[in-house]
Amino acid sequence: MNVIEGGVAAPNAKIAIVISRFNSFINESLLSGAIDTLKRFGQVSEENITVVRCPGAVELPLVAQRVAKTAKYDAIVSLGSVIRGGTPHFEYVCSECNKGLAQVSLEYSIPVAFGVLTVDTIDQAIERAGTKAGNKGAEAALSALEMINVLSQIES
């Protein structure tokens, strides 16, 4: 029986990080966690990491699609945060962001790691951006690295 599993070291990988500016006080912590993880665990050099900023979570799929279309990158890490308010807007934003990023991954056959927080409160966002609940940006970066290696093994 063959088992394919991916490690996280990918020293030659080119990674794009697409990040929303809205809620930047949270997202910058996610970005720091992602970059640190790519460099320390993935052994990805800084010159192989590109950060692309966009206004909000709704714009992440289009930016990720344009990045994927260039075929310059081995994976995309998407980062952002959507905090529930008093209207249905939260559900629409989260749903469209999630579906759009998944569509990019399938359309371009590239890992698109989901590091977009979808939380009820600012406190939950803070917890997931590097305090009590870890750093979801770092987790998304690990997922991207592992997927690069899994797909590489499948194709070889």
Swiss-Prot record:
Catalytic site: H89 (proton donor)
InterPro entries (UniProt xref): LS, LS/RS, LS/RS_sf
Reactions performed catalytically: (2S)-2-hydroxy-3-oxobutyl phosphate + 5-amino-6-(D-ribitylamino)uracil = 6,7-dimethyl-8-(1-D-ribityl)lumazine + phosphate + 2 H2O + H(+)
Keywords for this protein: Riboflavin biosynthesis, Transferase
Pathway the protein acts in: Cofactor biosynthesis; riboflavin biosynthesis; riboflavin from 2-hydroxy-3-oxobutyl phosphate and 5-amino-6-(D-ribitylamino)uracil: step 1/2
Enzymatic class: transferase
GO CC term, one of those recorded: riboflavin synthase complex
Amino-acid positions noted as binding 5-amino-6-(D-ribitylamino)uracil in the UniProt annotation, renumbered to this chain: F22, A57, V58, E59, S81, V82, I83, F114
Family from the record: Belongs to the DMRL synthase family.
Binding partners and assembly: Forms an icosahedral capsid composed of 60 subunits, arranged as a dodecamer of pentamers.
Stated name of the protein: 6,7-dimethyl-8-ribityllumazine synthase
Organism, as annotated: Aliivibrio salmonicida (strain LFI1238) (Vibrio salmonicida (strain LFI1238))
